[in-house]
C-alpha cells in the first residue's frame, strides 16, 4: 500500500532520550524556576503528573492545555493562573537547558529529508503533553526545524493524547488524509503502534524502544532509521 503521509513521534524517536533521565532533569529545572512562588519541589512534580494524567484522560471536551491547568489549579488554587506567565517563560527560556538530558542522532534528520525527497508528506505526531515552545525546541534539538513538518501537536492544539486512538483521528482529520495512506513511526509499542487499529501502517523504531508489555515486535516492521528509509523509499534510496 502506497504511503503518502509519514507521521513521526518525537521523544525517543527523532530525539533520542532515556525518558526517566529526561523527566528527572526537566523537573529539577522547573522546580528551580518556580520555587520563589512557593511551589515545593515534590508537590510541584506530583501536581505536574496529576495535570499530565488529566491530559491523557481528556475526552475531547477541552484542549489539553485547559485540562492541565484545570487539574493543576485544583491542587494549588487559582493563583496558578497568575503564575502561568512564569511557567510559559520557563518553556521558552530555561527549558533549553533540558537539551543536556537528550541524545542526538543525525540519522533522524537524514531520514526525514530522504522521506520528503521521496514525495511523502510528513507531520510530527508527538504526544501533546508539552506547550508549543517546548515542542519547537525539542524539534530543533533533533536537528530539524518546525517548518519541516506540516503539523506538530502541542497541548494547545490538541484535545486527546496517546494512546487514545482519537488522538490519531484528530491528527489525520487536521491533515486531511486517510488512515490507510499514513505510516506512523514511533518507538513505543503501545502508544505509537496503536495507530494500526485505525488502519494506519506502522513502523517501530527500535533505537530507544519502549515495550512495557513485552510485546512481540516482530509483528510490525521495525528497525533503525536506515531500515525505515528502505521501508518507505525502497532499496534504491537506501543510503
Put a short name on every predicted segment.
Residues 63-66, 83-85, 92-123:
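Short, acidic loop-to-helix structural element flanking the phosphoryl-transfer center
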Residues 18-21, 59, 217:
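Short, solvent-exposed loop/turn segments at secondary-structure boundaries
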Residues 23-31, 48-52, 69, 90-95, ...:
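Hydrophobic alpha-helical core bundles mediating ligand binding, dimerization, or RNAP-core interactions
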Residues 125-127:
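A cross-family glycoside hydrolase active-site/sugar-binding cleft signature
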Residues 1-6, 109, 113, 129-130, ...:
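Asp-based, Mg2+/Mn2+-dependent phosphohydrolase catalytic module
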Residues 1-47:
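Active-site neighborhood of HAD-like aspartate-dependent phosphohydrolases
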Residues 46-92:
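A metal-dependent, Asp-based hydrolase signature
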Residues 52-66, 95-103, 157-167, 194-201:
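Short amphipathic alpha-helical segments at helix boundaries and their inter-helical linkers
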Amino acid at each position: 500500500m502506497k504511503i503518502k503521509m509519514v507521521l513521526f513521534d518525537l521523544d525517543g524517536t527523532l530525539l533520542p532520550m532515556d525518558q526517566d533521565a529526561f523527566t528527572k532533569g526537566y523537573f529539577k529545572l522547573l522546580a528551580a524556576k518556580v520555587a520563589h512562588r512557593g511551589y515545593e519541589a515534590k508537590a510541584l512534580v506530583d501536581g505536574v503528573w496529576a495535570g499530565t494524567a488529566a491530559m491523557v484522560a481528556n475526552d475531547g471536551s477541552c484542549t489539553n492545555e485547559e485540562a492541565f491547568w484545570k487539574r493543576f489549579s485544583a491542587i494549588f488554587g487559582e493563583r496558578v493562573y497568575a503564575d502561568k506567565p512564569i511557567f510559559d517563560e520557563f518553556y521558552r527560556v530555561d527549558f533549553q537547558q533540558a537539551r543536556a538530558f537528550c541524545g542526538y542522532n543525525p540519522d533522524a534528520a537524514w531520514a526525514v529529508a530522504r522521506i520528503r525527497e521521496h514525495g511523502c508528506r510528513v507531520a510530527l505526531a508527538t504526544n501533546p503533553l508539552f506547550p508549543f515552545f517546548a515542542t519547537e525546541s525539542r524539534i530543533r534539538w533533533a536537528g530539524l526545524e518546525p517548518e519541516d513538518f506540516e503539523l506538530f501537536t502541542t497541548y494547545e492544539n490538541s484535545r486527546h493524547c496517546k494512546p487514545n486512538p482519537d488522538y490519531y483521528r484528530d491528527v489525520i482529520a487536521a491533515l486531511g488524509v486517510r488512515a490507510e495512506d499514513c505510516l506512523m513511526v514511533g518507538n513505543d509499542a503501545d502508544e505509537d503502534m496503536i495507530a494500526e487499529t485505525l488502519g494506519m501502517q506502522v513502523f517501530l523504531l527500535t533505537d530507544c524502544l519502549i515495550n512495557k508489555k513485552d510485546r512481540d515486535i516482530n509483528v510490525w516492521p521495525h528497525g533503525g532509521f536506515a531500515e525505515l528509509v528502505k521501508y518507505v523509499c525502497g532499496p534504491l534510496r537506501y543510503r
